[in-house]
Amino acid sequence: MPRPPRKRTVEFVPEINYFKPAGVPLRELQEEVLNVDELEAVRLKDIEGLDQQDAAKKMNVSRSTFQLILTNAREKISKALVSGKAIRIEGGIYQVRDCQCGCEQHRHRGGPKSS
Protein backbone atom coordinates (compact mmCIF):
# COMPACT_ATOMS: atom_id res chain seq x y z
CA MET A 1 0.00 0.00 0.00
CA PRO A 2 1.51 3.38 -0.98
CA ARG A 3 1.91 5.99 1.69
CA PRO A 4 -0.54 8.90 1.59
CA PRO A 5 0.72 11.94 -0.31
CA ARG A 6 2.21 14.75 1.77
CA LYS A 7 0.47 18.10 1.59
CA ARG A 8 2.36 20.73 -0.35
CA THR A 9 2.69 24.13 1.30
CA VAL A 10 1.44 27.13 -0.66
CA GLU A 11 1.53 30.84 0.14
CA PHE A 12 -0.82 32.04 -2.59
CA VAL A 13 -4.43 31.04 -3.22
CA PRO A 14 -5.86 32.93 -6.20
CA GLU A 15 -9.05 34.96 -5.92
CA ILE A 16 -9.68 34.50 -9.64
CA ASN A 17 -9.68 30.83 -10.52
CA TYR A 18 -10.99 30.68 -14.09
CA PHE A 19 -9.48 31.96 -17.32
CA LYS A 20 -10.90 31.51 -20.80
CA PRO A 21 -10.18 32.68 -24.31
CA ALA A 22 -12.06 35.85 -25.23
CA GLY A 23 -14.99 35.50 -27.60
CA VAL A 24 -15.57 31.77 -27.08
CA PRO A 25 -18.78 30.74 -25.27
CA LEU A 26 -18.25 28.61 -22.15
CA ARG A 27 -20.38 25.79 -23.53
CA GLU A 28 -17.94 25.37 -26.43
CA LEU A 29 -14.77 25.28 -24.32
CA GLN A 30 -12.71 22.41 -23.08
CA GLU A 31 -10.82 22.93 -19.82
CA GLU A 32 -7.45 22.24 -18.31
CA VAL A 33 -7.56 21.96 -14.51
CA LEU A 34 -4.51 23.46 -12.82
CA ASN A 35 -4.13 22.47 -9.17
CA VAL A 36 -3.37 25.17 -6.60
CA ASP A 37 -0.01 23.55 -5.82
CA GLU A 38 0.87 23.55 -9.53
CA LEU A 39 0.12 27.27 -9.73
CA GLU A 40 2.30 27.81 -6.66
CA ALA A 41 5.21 26.00 -8.33
CA VAL A 42 4.93 28.24 -11.41
CA ARG A 43 4.67 31.32 -9.20
CA LEU A 44 7.75 30.44 -7.16
CA LYS A 45 9.90 29.52 -10.15
CA ASP A 46 8.77 31.92 -12.87
CA ILE A 47 7.56 34.97 -10.94
CA GLU A 48 9.60 34.87 -7.72
CA GLY A 49 12.65 33.57 -9.62
CA LEU A 50 13.61 30.97 -7.03
CA ASP A 51 15.79 28.04 -8.01
CA GLN A 52 14.15 24.63 -7.76
CA GLN A 53 15.83 23.69 -4.48
CA ASP A 54 14.64 26.84 -2.68
CA ALA A 55 11.16 26.61 -4.19
CA ALA A 56 10.92 22.95 -3.15
CA LYS A 57 11.82 23.90 0.44
CA LYS A 58 9.09 26.56 0.47
CA MET A 59 6.54 23.98 -0.72
CA ASN A 60 7.82 21.32 1.70
CA VAL A 61 8.59 18.81 -1.08
CA SER A 62 11.73 17.27 -2.56
CA ARG A 63 13.43 18.94 -5.51
CA SER A 64 12.41 16.06 -7.80
CA THR A 65 8.78 16.36 -6.70
CA PHE A 66 8.91 20.11 -7.32
CA GLN A 67 10.27 19.46 -10.83
CA LEU A 68 7.39 17.06 -11.53
CA ILE A 69 4.79 19.54 -10.23
CA LEU A 70 6.31 22.36 -12.31
CA THR A 71 6.51 20.22 -15.47
CA ASN A 72 2.86 19.16 -15.12
CA ALA A 73 1.76 22.76 -14.55
CA ARG A 74 3.65 24.13 -17.54
CA GLU A 75 2.27 21.35 -19.76
CA LYS A 76 -1.31 22.15 -18.73
CA ILE A 77 -0.83 25.89 -19.25
CA SER A 78 0.82 25.34 -22.65
CA LYS A 79 -1.95 22.98 -23.81
CA ALA A 80 -4.59 25.51 -22.80
CA LEU A 81 -2.88 28.39 -24.60
CA VAL A 82 -2.10 26.46 -27.78
CA SER A 83 -5.47 24.68 -28.00
CA GLY A 84 -7.68 27.57 -26.87
CA LYS A 85 -8.86 25.83 -23.71
CA ALA A 86 -10.03 27.43 -20.48
CA ILE A 87 -7.94 27.07 -17.32
CA ARG A 88 -9.69 26.26 -14.04
CA ILE A 89 -7.58 26.54 -10.88
CA GLU A 90 -8.77 24.23 -8.13
CA GLY A 91 -7.89 21.27 -5.97
CA GLY A 92 -4.61 19.59 -5.25
CA ILE A 93 -3.08 18.31 -2.06
CA TYR A 94 -1.96 21.45 -0.26
CA GLN A 95 -2.04 23.49 2.92
CA VAL A 96 -1.78 27.25 3.19
CA ARG A 97 1.31 28.48 5.04
CA ASP A 98 0.50 30.26 8.30
CA CYS A 99 1.90 33.76 8.37
CA GLN A 100 1.91 36.83 10.56
CA CYS A 101 1.46 39.38 7.79
CA GLY A 102 -2.27 40.04 8.26
CA CYS A 103 -2.91 39.27 4.61
CA GLU A 104 -6.37 37.72 5.07
CA GLN A 105 -6.56 34.24 3.55
CA HIS A 106 -2.89 34.33 2.53
CA ARG A 107 -3.38 35.81 -0.91
CA HIS A 108 0.08 37.44 -0.85
CA ARG A 109 -0.32 40.05 -3.53
CA GLY A 110 2.38 42.49 -2.62
CA GLY A 111 2.06 42.16 1.15
CA PRO A 112 -0.73 42.78 3.62
CA LYS A 113 -4.09 43.96 2.38
CA SER A 114 -5.00 47.47 3.43
CA SER A 115 -8.28 48.09 5.23
From Swiss-Prot:
Lineage, top-rank taxon, reads: Bacteria
What range does the record give for the signal peptide? none
Alphabetized PANTHER family for the sequence: PTHR37478, UPF0251 PROTEIN TK0562
Family that this chain belongs to: Belongs to the UPF0251 family.
For this entry, the protein name equals UPF0251 protein Nther_2417
Origin organism is: Natranaerobius thermophilus (strain ATCC BAA-1301 / DSM 18059 / JW/NM-WN-LF)
- From which lineage does this chain's organism come? Bacteria, Bacillati, Bacillota, Clostridia, Natranaerobiales
